[in-house]
């Protein structure tokens, strides 16, 4: 009897995960989830273009004041299917897939501090190497941190072929409040664990950061329907908003 042991095509799996995310903004959701898992109370996300030999490069910067990462944490961050959150019910990430969307870029730079050590990790040309059937490696430098204050800062260069149309301020803000942990409705249910978490956002078309507080923003309930029709006529239904609360088991 012969035995077949299934194998995994590592490079192909990295390619499938990194490039099969349908929405480029999914990178933002994954970054926010990681920040919550790191117990961060403050996040900063910004988009800008920089010039490299006459070429405009999209630069995404993601920062938080969470617990930071050590070598084990960095290994998990770059690995496929290796999640340090899998056995923690309070954590969001559990599959070890999400951050691989970062690999759809030219370069990833991570600077993080944990337990008095500063780690600087660089992955060059992940997209090109994966398409050449090569798993990209990460170079890590370790040094003493100037402060024991932990944090993580990630810079992603050349993401999504430098296409910038999705990263306008209003578009990113809307995505954050509808599709990420920052837009959770838990406060509506009397859960205030994350009420002090804030995010500072600067879209590709902005020069200043906007402070976004935790929790989905619901519109005010509208005035009486009859008054809406008096004001907006046939467009009145577009302006109708009513909050319903149902109790049950």
Enumerate the predicted regions with their spans:
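Acidic ATP/Mg2+-coordinating residue in the GHKL
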Residues: 64
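Bergerat-fold GHKL ATPase/HATPase_c domain
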Residues: 1-55, 72-78
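ATP-binding catalytic core of ATPases
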Residues: 132-205
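Short beta-strand element(s) in the Bergerat
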Residues: 55-60, 152
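GHKL/Bergerat-fold ATPase module in large chromosome/replication-associated machines
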Residues: 192-249
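Flexible hinge/switch segments at interdomain interfaces of large molecular machines
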Residues: 2-14, 171, 211, 215-220
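Flexible ATP-lid and adjacent glycine-rich G1/G2 motifs of the Bergerat
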Residues: 67-132
């Amino acid at each position: 009897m012969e035995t077949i042991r299934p194998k995994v095509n590592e490079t192909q799996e990295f390619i499938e995960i990194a490039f099969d995310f349908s929405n480029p903004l999914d990178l933002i959701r994954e970054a926010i989830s990681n920040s919550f898992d790191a117990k961060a109370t403050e996040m900063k996300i910004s988009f800008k273009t920089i010039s490299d030999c006459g070429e405009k490069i999209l630069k995404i910067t993601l920062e938080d004041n969470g617990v930071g990462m050590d070598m084990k944490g960095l290994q998990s961050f770059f690995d496929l299917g290796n999640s340090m959150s899998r056995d923690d019910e309070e954590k969001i990430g559990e599959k070890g897939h999400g951050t691989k969307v970062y690999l759809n870029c030219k370069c990833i730079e991570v600077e993080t501090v944990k337990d008095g050590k500063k780690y600087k990790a660089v992955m060059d040309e992940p997209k090109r190497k994966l398409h050449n059937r090569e798993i990209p490696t990460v170079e890590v430098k370790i040094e003493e941190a100037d402060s024991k204050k932990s944090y993580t800062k990630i810079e992603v260069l050349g993401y999504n072929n430098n296409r910038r149309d999705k990263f306008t301020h209003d578009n990113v803000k809307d995505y954050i409040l509808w599709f990420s942990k920052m837009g959770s409705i838990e406060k509506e249910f009397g859960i205030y664990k994350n009420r002090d978490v804030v995010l500072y956002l600067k879209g590709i078309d902005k020069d200043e950061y906007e402070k976004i507080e935790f929790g989905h923003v619901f519109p005010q309930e509208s005035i009486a329907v009859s008054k809406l029709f008096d004001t907006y006529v046939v467009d009145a239904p577009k302006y109708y908003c009513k909050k319903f609360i149902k109790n049950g088991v």
